[in-house]
Amino acid sequence: MMRRYRRKNSSIPIIVEGRNDLASLRKLSFYGEIIVFNRGISITSFSDEISNKYREVIILTDFDNKGSFLKDRFYGYLTGMGVYVDLYLWNFIRKHVPIRTVEELPAEFEREVEKEIQM
């Protein structure tokens, strides 16, 4: 799953909430464009900027209430502006990975790798 999205990120940007989320994805070898939302502008203004620049985005906000709220708002605004929003990775992580934030992904990924090595 991660390998697939690393490749996808080479041509499609990922939207995250903050700089620490960006750093976490870099630790997981996501080297494509990652756009940080938390820049002091409204969701509608941010969505406008995104829709003027991209036809498709991947949303990877946190998995807590605030992150879910932002995901839903981005999805509503961006799809209404004609942008295809990929939520598959967000939904997959939410369902299968016991974390609440994007920042926790690298540590969880390391734990999974260690489990497989020990088997």
Swiss-Prot record:
GO terms for molecular function: metal ion binding. Binds two Mg(2+) per subunit. Mg(2+) 1 binds at E17, D62. Its cofactor is Mg(2+). The keyword Cytoplasm does not apply. Pfam families: Toprim. Mg(2+) 2 binds at D62, D64. PROSITE patterns: TOPRIM (PS50880). Residues 11-93 form the Toprim domain. Keywords: Magnesium, Metal-binding. PANTHER family: UPF0292 PROTEIN MJ1624, UPF0292 PROTEIN TK1411. Belongs to the UPF0292 family. This is UPF0292 protein TV1259. The lineage of its organism: Archaea, Methanobacteriati, Thermoplasmatota, Thermoplasmata, Thermoplasmatales.
